[in-house]
Amino acid sequence: MVSQARKSELLFSGSDWNFAKLARVYDEIEALGLEKLGLDIYPVQMEVISSEQMLDAYSSVGMPLMYRHWSFGKRFLYDELLYRKGARGLAHELVINSSPCIVYLMEENTMALQALVIAHAALGHNHFFKNNHLFRQWTDAGGILSYLDFAKSYIARCEERHGLTAVEAILDSAHALMEQGVFRYRRPPKLSSEQQREGLRERLEYEERSFNDLLRTLPPSPGKSKPEATDEILAERKKSLKLPEENLLYFLEKNSLVLEPWQREIIRIVRIIAQYFYPQQQTQVMNEGCATFVHYTLMNTLFDRCRISEGAMLEILRNHSNAVFQPAYDDPRYSRINPYALGLDMMQDIQRISTAPTAEDRDWFPDIAGRGDWRDTLLDAWANHRDESFVRQYLSPTLIRKWRLFMLADSADEPHYEVASIHNERGYAKIRSALAQSYDVGASRPDIQVIDVDLLGDRRLRLQHTVKNGIMLEGASRDATLRHIRNLWGYEVSMVALDAETGAMLSERSTKEI
Amino acid sequence: MPIFIDRRLNPKDKSLGNRQRFLRRAREELKRSIRDKVRAGGIAELDREHVVPIPRKGTGEPTFGDDKESGRRQHILPGNRTFSSGDLIPKPGGGGGYGSAAGTTESEDDFRFVLSREEVLDLFFEDLELPDLVKLNLKQVLSFKPRRAGFAASGAPTNINVGRTMRNSHGRRIALRRPKQAELDAIARQIAELEAKPASALVRERIAALREALDRLERRRKRIAYVDPVDIRFNRFDPQPLPNANAVMFCLMDVSGSMGEREKDLAKRFFVLLHLFLTRRYERTDIVFIRHTHLAKEVDEHTFFYHTESGGTVVSTALEEMHRIIEQRYPVAEWNIYAAQASDGDNFAGDSERCIELLDRKLMRLCQYFAYVEIIDERESHIFGATENGTSLWRAYNAVDGKWPNFQMRRIAAPADIYPVFRQLFARQPDLRKSA
């Protein structure tokens, strides 16, 4: 190893970059990643952009193509404001879960940073996107860009045909329900090709034109009394509408009585984009951890082999440590647990447990402790876990001690917090479980479902909010969101809050009162 | 080898459209915020610069979110040094969560829009307009102002443009090769020299030739004038129509004993608003202040609002005074005439009929718009809010109201009423037409 290192020369020198250097560095890093970490990646497409373009990309939820909406403009102005004031730096990179995997490089970056970005994004994130089961099952990397292209032009066409205001109203309402617009347990269908979409839309429009059973509003014939709403009929009705339904956007798209076909299509677009981002929200720690682990390992290896200079390595390390900085809870800089730091630490911990376990590790992780094949363990974890299960499975007592993690129990009606557990023998399991729980997107979001609607009666849409741990919805934004649902549904919308444990009704709110 | 694409030369500002959409939306919020401010802070506020913060969440994007003030939670935090299980930590002030430490809130800056005085007023008056303004302007273009518009080949002698004329003549003289005086002089000198010499046949011949040349040049000089009529250029003037954008506002106020400080204050606020509005809309705005008790007098602004004087009430005197001033100083052809009258509605018995007559016969034909604002007691507002009943003046004016569409009347009981009423009075009224 040492003799080989002596022989080899630097990959690059100086801080300027050019395309030849980038290509050389990429090839080297890719070969190293495949050889040393066994990575498996989508082909890479690297795009060099300026900082302004980075701001643009930032504000349209990181996608290269996005339909137009004022909220993206707001994000842009806000990001730009912070950037101009120096309150926030720009990300050095942006990577898109698509095939080929698109990596944005900023032209302002130095060569050392570009190398870091390549290792981090083009290999780390890329591997994660391609192999993690959530992304494999739930997102269609090959189809997303063409879908976004379609969405953008479709919405632009709607704006031309129906006016900005009309489109904006639908988008505003749909955006308000984005978090309630994903299937959590059912896998969404694969994104269809342009042709299929066209066919689908035509069919939709045809259905709309032709008779719609739901719209039958003839008064009952005089001789016949109105059928009683027996349990049987109720059950039948729920079954025909596939209730309860947790995906509010989906329900509205399919069943709303007032929406035009183009409005349904827009809701569908918002829903599909929400669904596309759902896995990303569940895998922040893992995704960033994976990318950080990969760049840290690869950069150090390159340095050990004398392929990068000490100066470049220092710059890389400085950026690396900025990214994984984790202030303590009482530090003014603290905002939350840094997913880069937690992910990297856990993955390095797995490496340590595999190669140099303590007795405690052998107790806690009998499967992997001392087996030495940390690489396979990591590849397996990257492929098969999301944040919640990853923390639940791999957060070790060593790490809990190192981070000095502790748990506060916070009850709104108490004047104080209680320290429920700290990093000791009795606390490890509890802390691990609570931290895992906090990464469970499904559990930490309000659980709201459509439970019933009487299509033949007053057409009131009835929602149910299952209240866990007594956490209610914030009043003002709840009312505003209900109004948005009403816009899409066209008739009264009411929501009851039921306690998850006791089943007691905590509150009821209808758009009639708002 | 990966694919590289250089996107740096791609168009920037991909989000320009998004930003425009956002600003258009923010404008609505700005408008609302300005209105609220003015309503709360008084009309004087209106005439200043404003900084209007729009919270980042301001242009709302609501979602179903947890109420931070309810329920039971667990927070996992790093960096414990001092606590052990079971310790109790008091929550910081008033249960606002563990501040940022709980990882739930991020401090967020607001957008701040700094609006100049003009922008504030523009937002404030955006959809207000004085009725009938456009129509009058289109109908009567009354004065013209001459404006230089190049040169003409014909015109009055006073308008000759000497510079341009001489330039033309100079060019023509060069083009037609008009002999110069110097050439003639030179030949004359030669002739004189030859004549001084002893005469010989050769000399005589030379002299004859020179004389002939001189003669030819002189004839040519006569043919080609120094200044020819074709050279002459006149300044050309175009008459330009001047828009008739003058407005005069008559402020009529009852200052009899029944008008207390509160009533005057309300009236003043209404007039201030009207004045701001008129200065905004017209190039030139005059205000005439007329106060009346049983006698009416034109006064200056300060006296109008602050002078204390008392007496009986004869409203018609103010109307007569107004009519007199219009006749004297404001020819209807040139001025848009507006009037706002504020009163508590008390009037001398029998005078109200005279008021009707004055308005009906004279003033309403002259006025573009006449607004009557009756200031009533707050306790009366719920009684009279919507009824036709009221003071003698109110009942009398009701008759005028029905007859003249450019007459409007409203009641005001509190400062908060002023702006809505003002808006009602001056909202765009497409079908408002001056009859006869």
UniProtKB/Swiss-Prot annotation, chain B:
Keywords: Plasmid
Keyword Cytoplasm attached: no
Source superkingdom: Bacteria
InterPro entries assigned to the protein according to its UniProt record, in alphabetical order: UPF0229 (IPR006698)
Stored Pfam families: DUF444
Region (Disordered): 54-103
Family designation: Belongs to the UPF0229 family.
The protein's name: UPF0229 protein mll9637
Organism: Mesorhizobium japonicum (strain LMG 29417 / CECT 9101 / MAFF 303099)
